[in-house]
From Swiss-Prot:
Taxonomic path: Viruses, Duplodnaviria, Heunggongvirae, Peploviricota, Herviviricetes
Topology of this chain in the membrane: Single-pass membrane protein
Name used for this protein in its record: Protein U33
Transmembrane segments: 80-102
Family matches, as InterPro entries: UL49
Entry keywords, A to Z: Host membrane, Membrane, Transmembrane, Transmembrane helix
Subcellular location, principal: host cell
Source superkingdom: Viruses
GO cellular component: host cell membrane; membrane; viral tegument
Length: 470
């Protein structure tokens, strides 16, 4: 049965015409390769089973490889599947096994949402004892139910199509790590006194009986998370050449301390888990007039823990990683809320994750800094996406919706843009682009540069007037 991996590499691997780490990105981001370049894209479908057009295309390419293969390969295929003639059902089964093989390789590096980690050797062992009549039925007429039954036999869980990436916090799946459990012992430093020694021993004694796991480790995680959230800069004591805990450590090294792993994961999560993206400013001619600014303009409420924008309103921002942001908590008005306000504690909570760590961020802002005695003025534009995982939009083929500030200089409203790619988003704030809201299309308001008798020109109009367009 050890021939199965060799067979998959000979017949299915040539159908993957892409660069390295593409399969890793495929399982993390959901779609990270050009269509037609990877056979695993057969499993990226919103339908009940595989996409018929994509399957037919790869089957034709696979059949050409099958005709050129060696007699030994045909003999191994007959020995494993008891088939002399290549059929589409056998191709679908081989593609599924290749999908499982690549999944096992990815799960050696990191843990993914709802994907069970099993070694490929164990998969081969279980596949060997799969009932022959069920295998023949699958080869004769492949369907989702037959493939799902085989998947249940191998992994003891249902097959998720497409590849599961729809979670509350997709970024954190990168940092779940290998065998990440909450039973790590936290080392306590204390003085050698009798009344002090009895307290840790008592905690250790009752922690083994607690059904909630190791509460000391949970408390330590909470302290680390709160510190990383409140501090602007901090150091994490990471061993040299062991910065990436996703990569399996060498046998001579000890396990990476889980509390340090959690600190590293929290730090990376704070930088990656967000629904607000900063846009490059190619041209400053769209800098807004400060005469029309309001104090509450362009403020979005971001949950620092899950990264979602909580005041996007009723706008439905489509995204491959998106899900409905509707809260399951209802108030007296029977309306769903993204923000929960407690009348007892006078504290607001995120209705998606329950966190109190809420931050306010402006999607358009002019700021002034002093650098080496020189006054520097900056203009920042930002976009709000429908997912909290910013890395999912880095693929050129992914289309998504965004909320951006209106391009009119006298308007402080927002615009909902549909089917935007990352290339279009990076070129959005440029001289030739125009994205105005519906109100600005039917009205005109004068800025400082439009008034003939304007004496004090605002800061925004000065930037728009003096900075040369690119």
């Amino acid at each position: 049965m050890f021939y199965l991996k060799k067979l998959l590499r000979q017949l299915l691997a040539p159908l993957c015409k892409h660069g390295p780490y593409t399969h890793l990105q495929l399982f993390v981001m959901g779609d990270a390769c050009v269509p037609g370049k990877c056979v695993l894209t057969m499993f990226l479908t919103n339908k009940k089973f595989l996409n018929k057009e994509v399957t037919e295309k790869f089957y034709n390419e696979f059949f050409a490889i099958w005709l050129r293969c060696r007699p030994e390969t045909r003999f191994i295929t007959k020995r494993l599947f008891n088939k002399m003639v290549m059929t589409k059902g056998l191709f679908v089964l081989l593609a599924y096994l290749y999908f499982v093989y690549r999944q096992c390789k990815v799960l050696e590096l990191l843990s993914l949402y709802k994907l069970k980690r099993i070694k490929w050797m164990d998969v081969e062992t279980r596949f060997r004892v799969y009932p022959s009549y069920k295998l023949n039925k699958l080869l004769e007429m492949p369907s989702f139910s037959e493939i799902n039954e085989l998947h249940m036999f191998l992994f003891e869980q249902q097959l998720l199509l497409p590849i599961p990436t729809h979670v509350n916090l997709p970024c954190m799946r990168l940092f779940c790590l290998r065998d990440y459990e909450q039973t790590e012992t936290v080392m306590l430093r204390y003085r050698q006194r009798e009344h002090v020694l009895s307290f840790p021993s008592m905690l250790q004694k009752y922690a083994l009986k607690s059904p909630a796991g190791n509460f000391m480790f949970t408390m330590a995680k909470a302290l680390v998370e709160n510190f990383c959230f409140s501090a602007d800069r901090y150091l994490i004591p990471v061993e040299h050449n062991n910065l990436v805990p996703m990569v399996p450590s060498k046998p001579e090294r000890g396990d990476f301390p889980k509390i340090l792993t959690f600190a590293l994961a929290t730090s990376l999560k704070d930088g990656l888990a967000t629904s607000v993206i900063s846009l490059p400013v190619m041209c400053y001619c769209k800098t807004k007039c400060s005469r029309f600014i309001l104090e509450e303009s362009y403020i979005c409420v971001i949950c620092a823990k899950c990264g979602h924008c909580l005041n996007s309103g009723k706008e439905k921002l489509c995204s491959p990683q998106g899900f409905s942001l509707s809260s399951m908590f209802y108030f007296r008005d029977k309306q769903e809320k993204n923000l929960i306000y407690s009348m007892h504690t006078d504290v607001m909570y995120c209705s998606l994750c329950g966190s109190q760590q809420l931050v306010f961020e402006r999607i358009y802002e002019m700021s002034e800094h002093c650098v080496l005695g020189m006054k520097v003025e900056t203009v920042s534009w930002k976009a709000v996406i429908g997912t909290n995982s910013a890395c999912t939009i880095l693929n050129d083929n992914v289309k998504f919706d965004v909320i951006v500030p209106c391009s009119c200089r006298s308007c402080y409203s927002t615009v909902h843009l549909y089917n935007v790619t990352v290339k279009k988003l990076l070129r959005l704030v440029s001289h030739g682009s125009d994205f105005q809201c519906q109100h600005c299309q039917h009205s005109f308001r004068e800025t400082c540069l439009d008034l003939e008798d304007c004496v004090n020109i605002c800061q925004g109009c000065q930037i728009s007037q003096n900075v040369r367009c690119i």
